[in-house]
């Protein structure tokens, strides 16, 4: 997910994306705990995407 794509979204779309990524993160954690996850780097990528979205939400809140 690119930063430019995220910047073009409004606050509601970012919140929806954040919710979706948190659900994905939970699924990946459960898969890792049960030993089913082969590509563990996905957890890190999702965590970083969540951080990007939270940063953008904070920036947009400050501007308003």
Swiss-Prot record:
GO terms for cellular component: cytosolic large ribosomal subunit. It holds the Pfam family Ribosomal_L29. Disulfide bonds: none annotated. The keyword Ribosomal protein applies. Keywords: Ribonucleoprotein, Ribosomal protein. Signal peptide: none annotated. HAMAP family: Ribosomal_uL29. Belongs to the universal ribosomal protein uL29 family. This is Large ribosomal subunit protein uL29. It comes from Dichelobacter nodosus (strain VCS1703A).
């Amino acid at each position: 997910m690119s930063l430019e794509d995220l910047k073009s979204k409004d606050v509601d779309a970012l919140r929806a994306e954040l919710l979706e990524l948190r659900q994905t993160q939970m699924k990946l954690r459960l898969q890792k705990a049960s030993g089913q996850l082969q590509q563990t780097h996905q957890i890190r990528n999702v965590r970083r995407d969540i951080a990007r979205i939270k940063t953008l939400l904070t920036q947009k809140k400050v501007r308003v």
